From Swiss-Prot:
Belongs to the bacterial ribosomal protein bL9 family. GO terms for cellular component: ribonucleoprotein complex; ribosome. The gene is rplI. SUPFAM superfamilies: L9 N-domain-like, Ribosomal protein L9 C-domain. One of its GO terms (biological process) is translation. Gene3D superfamilies: Ribosomal protein L9, C-terminal domain, Ribosomal protein L9, N-terminal domain. The keyword Secreted does not apply. Binds to the 23S rRNA. The lineage of its organism: Bacteria, Pseudomonadati, Myxococcota, Myxococcia, Myxococcales. It holds the Pfam family Ribosomal_L9_N. PANTHER family: 50S RIBOSOMAL PROTEIN L9. This is Large ribosomal subunit protein bL9. One of its GO terms (molecular function) is rRNA binding.
Length: 149
């Protein structure tokens, strides 16, 4: 029996997959629970259409992420902080600080997409990785300078 899965089913497939199962399993388990629909020509055509729409949407998201990555590489960020002995900062520079500085320069990013393993605690230049998409990552150049007293 051929079925189209509506949701992920363990040991069988993911939502949207066309699967071949034993008639009893399909009739008595998958169909009554709404986990699958029969694979008639109408449903198969609808599935193909949904996959095409999803692929187009994914391509659009990836393209916009690549554009943001390019913009990030062209947008250096300079942050001024109070400094103590040996160029150590009072406090630290976090992903939120970098996101706010980028927002001030016209690049809107969620702070969770900025990958800082640990906050920046010294003066200097840093390459901070940014995860924009599952396949696209960018880098932003962050310069931390001593604030004039």
């Amino acid at each position: 029996m051929k079925l189209i899965l509506r949701e992920d089913v363990e040991n069988l497939g993911k939502g949207g997959d066309l699967v071949d199962v034993k008639p009893g399993y399909g009739r008595n388990f998958l169909l009554p629970r709404g986990l699958a629909v029969t694979a008639n020509p109408k449903n198969v055509k609808e599935l193909e259409h949904q996959k095409a729409v999803a692929a187009a949407k994914a391509a659009k998201l990836k393209a916009s992420a690549q554009a943001v990555a390019k913009r990030l590489s062209e947008t250096p960020v300079t942050l001024k902080r109070k400094v103590g002995e040996q160029d150590k900062l009072y406090g630290s520079v976090t992903a939120l600080d970098v996101a706010e500085a980028l927002a001030a320069r016209g690049v809107q990013l969620d702070r969770r997409s900025i990958v800082l393993d640990e906050p920046i605690k010294t003066v200097g230049e840093f390459e901070v990785p940014v995860k924009l998409h599952s396949e696209v990552a960018g880098k932003v150049k962050v310069t931390v300078e001593a604030e004039a007293e």
